[in-house]
């Protein structure tokens, strides 16, 4: 029997899902137990939805409601600074990555340029 991983989804996976990318739907289905996102991911997705008008904004809010929203705590902030310095990633990516690490979750992304390749980040597909 497989033990389900506790997942934290990167912004690109959620945007792919909202854009109808089948691989994103598969990943969200596979890691459906207690899925989480960073507050940064919530903000990034909602900024895009708000530009599309009230109907899509509401639909997106409802979609995001299925995820546990993890805050930027002091511990996440400290870890993000370390990751930003040591891994040379953009600050929003460092915060998302730190949120996963502090919460003992597997970060699921499809963008190796954001996180490198040998780093514990799961990249189930690429576009």
Set out the residue ranges of the language-model regions.
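Short active-site oxyanion
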Residues: 33-35, 65-68, 101-106
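Generic structural signal for small/hydrophobic residues in well-ordered secondary structure
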Residues: 10-11, 45, 80, 100
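Acidic, PIN/NYN-like endoribonuclease modules and their adjacent C-terminal/linker elements
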Residues: 1-4, 97-127
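Donor nucleotide-sugar recognition loop
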Residues: 86-92
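Short, well-structured N-terminal submotif of metal-dependent ribonuclease cores
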Residues: 1-37, 47-61
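Acidic catalytic patch
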Residues: 65-86
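Alpha-helix capping/helix-boundary segments
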Residues: 13-14, 41, 76, 95-96, ...
